[in-house]
Amino acid sequence: MSWQEKINAALDARRAADALRRRYPVAQGAGRWLVADDRQYLNFSSNDYLGLSHHPQIIRAWKQGAEQFGVGSGGSGHVSGYSVAHQALEEELAEWLGYSRALLFISGFAANQAVIAAMMAKEDRIVADRLSHASLLEAASLSPSQLRRFVHNDVTHLARLLASPCPGQQLVVTEGVFSMDGDSAPLGEIQQVTQQHNGWLMVDDAHGTGVIGEQGRGSCWLQKVKPELLVVTFGKGFGVSGAAVLCSSTVADYLLQFARHLIYSTSMPPAQAQALRASLAVIRSDEGDARREKLAALITRFRAGVQDLPFTLADSCSAIQPLIVGDNSRALQLAEKLRQQGCWVTAIRPPTVPAGTARLRLTLTAAHEMQDIDRLLEVLHGNG
């Protein structure tokens, strides 16, 4: 089989399964409205949970940062790309979340890959929730360590896997809020079992940070858990992009030596770090509390109105509200019908989610209004 035949076969298989991914160029993709092909849609696919991507204070901070520092960092943080803006953001994040150190990364994917690649050796074991994000599971699969997956949120199964003899160290990996189901991990129980077996806990709280807990401190703070490794991302609750790893001083020093994604990548622009500092200030403020309260009310309204639809509603109190349809083609058809009626909704299919669980992944944000939720419910009921 030639290279072209190999590529064609893979694409043909995706098409046959109604699983071919496509991108749509949009004129506006974050916030309440999505604009594509000169048409405006209510946007129920954005991860901009607090509606901060267009916040004037954050936009102003980015502009001022660009005027002060330029539009790029100029290099890796190990060479010339670590500015006083990066340093200030790291210190503010560490203080906010109660850690000694924070290290910035260009994306959550890079942060997860970097930590696992740097920390894990052949004699070690990774025990991951089987529904963990692709960045975590891919990094674990590529590492020299043994990878074992426990049944989603099943602490008993986790304990059984941890009890199996391991010559090295054990790292338990999970998410705070799961990206495709919107449910939360029982972090207190997971941490207890992990500590009983002398392991470390790594939590990716991409979808909880900024959105839940006191001052938006996220899933771990809400559940009174402090994992050894906490990954937070800035493309969801913060409304920007990038990520950080929160850890001890010695782990931070270790990652600065051995995390190749950090060492060999150009760091985020200092202007972006300034925007993130402004976003953090909003998240921690009374305004941040008000946005979280509004989002919670929108979620309650949606869940109350969707109960009698012929879909499986995930057990989620988060901004992620999936409606599990099952069949790939049915999910695609529903998403298209909703778009035709002015609601931009994305169909998520395998391999992103398990086979037979294709879904409409609906996301609600503080930028929405109650009438937007009512319109979504009206359209869903008309197509259920």
Swiss-Prot record:
Homodimer. Keywords: Biotin biosynthesis, Pyridoxal phosphate, Transferase. It holds the Pfam family Aminotran_1_2. Its EC number is 2.3.1.47. InterPro entries: Aminotrans_II_pyridoxalP_BS (IPR001917), Aminotransferase_I/II_large (IPR004839), AON_synthase_class-II (IPR050087), AONS_Archaea/Proteobacteria (IPR004723), AONS_Proteobacteria (IPR022834), PyrdxlP-dep_Trfase (IPR015424), PyrdxlP-dep_Trfase_major (IPR015421), PyrdxlP-dep_Trfase_small (IPR015422). PANTHER family: 8-AMINO-7-OXONONANOATE SYNTHASE, CLASS II AMINOTRANSFERASE/8-AMINO-7-OXONONANOATE SYNTHASE. It comes from the Bacteria. The modification N6-(pyridoxal phosphate)lysine is found at K236. The keyword Transferase applies. Its cofactor is pyridoxal 5'-phosphate. This is 8-amino-7-oxononanoate synthase. NCBIfam families: bioF (TIGR00858). Belongs to the class-II pyridoxal-phosphate-dependent aminotransferase family. BioF subfamily. Pathway: Cofactor biosynthesis; biotin biosynthesis. CDD domains: KBL_like. Disulfide bonds: none annotated. One of its GO terms (biological process) is biotin biosynthetic process.
